[in-house]
């Protein structure tokens, strides 16, 4: 093991604690260095946080002429509520989305160039308005480069266009073009410096007229020309551009961030100084998606009800993309925050987990039922996801039992070799405890062997449709003649037997048998075996559910490996170590669960609210919140609890047990949280890595403590 000087310790909660402390500094107006004005409302923040979360603020504060600004006026028609929600998201990583503010938040996120928030808003719209998804299916690149995202001052050019200094702008196809924004940011009143910069967004959504008949047309008029481009042009140059194409531009903001209104006179003067063909907005327009003009956000419920059933498939096929979306990485300018390490990626909850990425990129969100048994993990989701299927399955099984038949799915043969064929035995449950809903909650190894026998019998010619499923009881082992269906798979003479060496070692209490003429008989079911090892395997699998017992706590296990893993609890051995933080565990499964803390993976999802969890046990506990079930009652006072651990903690009130001990002052506590609070208050100990500021709003500390 490495020495403490060579080890690297990672605090998993450090990032969230720093963000929490920054939010508290903002709420107390400590070290805030910029004021954002949105529609006469002021928001104080830190420049570092703003530029780390927003591409717009990154482009502003990285410029040497603009980095010292202390007051920034955004577009007056930007919704202050949407900006407030995004500002809180920057400091808390929690996005408060509701149906009444989703459009404002999305428009503001587009304005601030927070693409991961835009993607989240789009998924929120798809989940809440399922009919919108079937109306228009737009690829991500086309949506981001479409009508709502482009800068107000758009220059449409071709390869032969030349700027003022006779330098060619760009040679290539139109799909590789970029928008040029001469007025991306205007400084405060008193500063007349114009800041030219390239937009990081491609213009693959614009199709320019080859004769440039509309180059001088105002953007407000161009937005009424057409709702969609007539045809998309592939970037490979294999197709020729027709003579006439219409371009679609919506009413967008005249300035990305400004203190003074950009007037048409200034635009005319700017146009007169340049030979390039670009259009100037006639006035300030908000970066708000137009509900009427944008069919993606069309919310006319009357029209949707009339057209939803008839033309749903036609619309989805009509707007299907004809070519592969462009790679926008090659079009990003040097000033784009996406080429900097400070540009934020998507939140960990939505990008790190492979399950989350699959759900985000998949278009079959509503085509597959969340309760599809094939999509569920039977061992982990059987109690949570299949609750709705249990009732219907039980009802079907009850109907079959009334007819005197056994379902092939629910059938399980008895463990004895000689089973009576009387009708009363047909409905007797076997020791395997196979439930009628298909759940294998308490199935021993013998039951799994029976399933193998069932599958092999179904494929044999002797198993016909009219044959009773109890046929296998009359089958005999070809090697030793035993009639037990379990023995057929366990006998060493049978070909294809795949039992490990550890299954041959059993305790003496399961080997009670009688030996006669070299043959071994089982005293439980009178099965005959040629070797003693076969008899031991038979006793282990058929007549014992959990033969391996711990000699310290009497815990029993089905497999020897589980017993060996259990003994590490008593010995304190933790051979499995995390390579990132050095934490050690006694089981590999615990190490696997721990590594999800570092990777951010949350594979278990609640089908009701969409919350994700690291462990399936956390998901099971969370599901009880929706069902309202409290299955754990206190036998003394009758109080019911949702979780078993809460009940165990409650029982200490009645028993008086105080298992948590303070080594410094010899005090005992009933709960672990009480001991932690005592250590913090009385002994000044830091019980975890979460450091919080304990100062009043009016008090400004001379030096901030360091977060661990």
Curated annotation (Swiss-Prot):
It is found in: Nucleus. GO terms for molecular function: chromatin binding; DNA-binding transcription repressor activity, RNA polymerase II-specific; RNA polymerase II cis-regulatory region sequence-specific DNA binding; sequence-specific DNA binding; zinc ion binding. Transmembrane segments: none annotated. GO terms for cellular component: nucleoplasm; nucleus. Residues 303-317 have a biased composition (Basic and acidic residues). It comes from the Eukaryota. A zinc finger (C2H2-type) spans 520-543, 548-570, 576-598, 604-626, 632-654, 660-683. CDD domains: BTB_POZ_ZBTB27_BCL6 (cd18331). PROSITE patterns: BTB, ZINC_FINGER_C2H2_1, ZINC_FINGER_C2H2_2. Keywords: Activator, DNA-binding, Immunity, Inflammatory response, Metal-binding, Nucleus, Repeat, Repressor, Transcription, Transcription regulation, Zinc, Zinc-finger. Residues 303-371, 431-470 are annotated as: Disordered. InterPro entries: BTB/POZ_dom, SKP1/BTB/POZ_sf, Znf_C2H2_sf, Znf_C2H2_type. Transcriptional repressor mainly required for germinal center (GC) formation and antibody affinity maturation which has different mechanisms of action specific to the lineage and biological functions. Forms complexes with different corepressors and histone deacetylases to repress the transcriptional expression of different subsets of target genes. Represses its target genes by binding directly to the DNA sequence 5'-TTCCTAGAA-3' (BCL6-binding site) or indirectly by repressing the transcriptional activity of transcription factors. This is B-cell lymphoma 6 protein homolog. It comes from Gallus gallus (Chicken).
